[in-house]
Amino acid sequence: MRNYISIALLLLASSVFAYDPPTMGWSSWNTYRVNISDKLIMKQADAMSRNGLKEVGYKYINIDDGYFGGRDASGELITHPVRFPNGLKQTVDHIHALGFKAGIYSDAGRNTCGSFWDKDSLGINVGFYGHDRQDADYFFKEIGFDFIKIDFCGGDAKQNFDQLGLDEQERYTAIHNAILATGRKDVRMNVCRWNFPGTWVHDVAFSWRISQDINPSWES
């Protein structure tokens, strides 16, 4: 009888302390900046699968800045004609076929960080600002991404060309609501500010930045 009680208590304790694991995986930014391609992303996914990283919790493969090709006449995002000539769906399908989840990048303002810091002109006017529902539908209903990192260079007047200064809580909340409106409840959103955003972030995101950029070195 005592053994049965011990087992019951163990099961109860396990359920009480159950939690969602952190978002672990790989992102293209620190190593490649905007110099990415569909072939590079799929090659990385293959390597992670081959080396068993998914089995130890590294489940996300995230396409960061550099895939943008501007917007068409209707405001729809298009991909870079050389880096992603076949669009994003083929790459996302490849990631999913390997059992991973696929992540993407955008900005809460008009322009991406790569457009400012890496002089990538195709990162201008591709952020969420003015396109919240349109971009959310594209990323999560049409393409099928599972994660999104949302930067704020386009909303920070010091880091964008039009000196657009936006309220970060308002912008991230609006994007969060646009994602929910797609019907997807499983999307993980990351708020990419360069310090702790504030307690409001608990209501809109699964994870967030707490510091300045790191770099691909052990010292960092």
Question: How does the language model describe each region?
Answer:
Residues R2-L9:
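Sec-dependent signal peptide recognition
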Residues A13-S15:
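N-terminal signal peptide c-region/cleavage motif recognized by signal peptidases
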Residues A18-M42, A47, I179:
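N-terminal module-boundary/linker segments of secreted carbohydrate-active enzymes
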Residues Y19-D20, K54-G57, G183-D186:
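Short helix-terminating capping/connector loops at secondary-structure junctions
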Residues L40, Q44, M48-F161:
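Aromatic-lined carbohydrate-binding/catalytic grooves of carbohydrate-active enzymes
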Residues E76-I78, K119-S121, Y172-I175, D203-W208:
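Short secondary-structure boundary/capping segments
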Residues N125, H131, V187-S220:
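Glycan-recognition surfaces
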Residues D146-I148, C153-V187, V191-R193:
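Extracytoplasmic, non-cytosolic globular domains
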